[in-house]
Amino acid sequence: AAFGYMPQTKNNSAGGATFGGVLRAPMKYVGAKTYNINGQDNTSSTGNPNAEWNSNTGEFIKNPDSDTEFGNSGVINYLNKFGRTGTTQGLYKYYDPLGELYYETLRYLQGLPPTSAAISGVTTALKDGFPVYTTWNDPYGGGRTPSSDYSCLKSNIVVIGDVNIDSSGSSRYPSTSATNNVPDRTGWLNTVNTLEKRASSNYLDA
């Protein structure tokens, strides 16, 4: 899967900045084969319909997920085409709210929906020439619910960026809800800030 920012024209302190990040390409198998939730090969006789490269030629496929709005899609394409999908070529994202992007990614891996702030007011211009998925399917499948235990599922998040990120106001995160796997982000943020200052802090790691 690939998450990314939408174009920002304001930083968070100025108000009115676009919240966090959005899903640009859903979780899937990008190669010739697919597998079920138990890791068993379940590739159809015609191959993986969402494969991102041609297994015969090795060429990348421009629109592997059959997007009808931009005719451009896929995990690899999103990574390869940073700043080159919108109307202005070479326009890269800035005022990056990395914490919010990371939080949205965690919600996706937990089987939760996107926050309303992340997907409200999404215009064609904000999509920047690439799909934005405002409804999500649980990437792990298996009939899990948002309150299910995801602790044993192995996940990895790779962040591509620079040091010039825009700190996010903690008030923009959803309210804590232990039953729905929404942790106390503000509390943990304060704990990390305290520890990074090499100060003492009491916290419960539950």
Model regions: which residues?
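P/S/T/G-enriched low-complexity
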Residues: 1-206
